[in-house]
Amino acid sequence: VSVLTSRFVTPDPSNGYEPIRRYGNLRTGTGEPLNERMSLFEEIAYNVFERVYQDDEVAPPDDIIHVSCSGYLSPSPVQSYLSRRGWLAVGVTHSYHMGCYGAFPAIRTALGLIGSSHVSLPKRKRRVDLVHTEFLSLHFDLLGDEPDNFVTSTLFADGFIKYAAYPETEFGKTGQNGLRILALDERILPDSLPEMTLRPGPLQFDMSLSKRVPFMIRDSITDFVSAICEQAGLDFEREKGAMVFAIHPGGPAILNQIRAKLGIEESQVELSRKVLHEHGNMASATAPHIWQLVLQSPDIPVGAKVLSMAFGPGLTVIGALFEKV
């Protein structure tokens, strides 16, 4: 079963929260405790679900996959929304705490949900929605003067987005452009566990990103992208000049190192840079924002191959090969 993504919706969930006043200097303990931050996450995330499903005519999906690395509660915001909306038969999957690469395991889960229903279950799934709620500013140390804090506070940002996955037969009824999944792959890089971390602290989630990360990714990226392309019967070196690269912009250095290593043009990564420049690093919500631009761009024709990848704790390198349809 081929699964396609389409109909991206990007809400503005702002409700006037004041993080500097409410959270102060997190490292010296003058801010709110973690449970208070999770309460605000719950409020914002619930607001996101209300906005992305505000059309009364929209039919409920078979499943919703909720993706986040910045807030977790039980019951979750998606469960609260479904209960109040009366969509009680919608399946819920929580895809949490994977950081910047979280969109790809979520797509893999959607692929599994749809594929298994068409092979071994009596009820075939027609649509699986994926909703990202990344509220990273909730965890910033806005007053800290440590060098590492400058990186996290200026690089990371809030991001919210919804899109959908369909079996091929159902996608044709939407009348939308989409991305057909051709291949998926994932690797953990050796000897890299401490280079990127995301751990709960007493007041907030502590994020760390070492200077070695761009170079460790660079050294592994050629073999990785070649393996993805081989799954789809493509030769990377032969095809790369015509590809679009939707690379998660973990930072400018990561994009620079990958582009140089793969020998691709700056124009092939311009959408990644555009999202980083305009929105920052929104963790798991970043790659879907780039996919949205791919689908909206009149300069990227139907049939174009899109090689997308992201990186996170582990170090994990994960990616997908798409075809614009």
Task: Annotate the PLM regions.
Residues 77-90, 97, 121, 125, ...:
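Intrinsically disordered, low-complexity linker/loop segments enriched in Gly/Pro
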Residues 69-70, 88, 94-118, 218, ...:
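Claisen-condensing/thiolase-fold acyl-transfer catalytic domains that form or cleave C-C bonds
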Residues 197-204, 208, 225-244, 249, ...:
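Membrane-interfacial loop- and helix-cap regions that link adjacent transmembrane helices
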Residues 73-79, 130-151, 185-200, 252-260, ...:
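Active-site-adjacent elements of ketosynthase-type condensing enzymes
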Residues 1-38, 142-219, 223-227, 311, ...:
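Condensing-enzyme catalytic core mediating Claisen C-C bond formation in acyl metabolism
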Residues 3-6, 60, 102-184, 288-325:
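Conserved beta-strand-centric core segments of catalytic alpha/beta enzyme folds
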Residues 2-85, 97, 235-255:
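Conserved beta-ketoacyl condensing-enzyme motif
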Residues 1, 41-56, 109, 160, ...:
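Short, well-ordered amphipathic alpha-helical segments that serve as non-catalytic structural scaffolds
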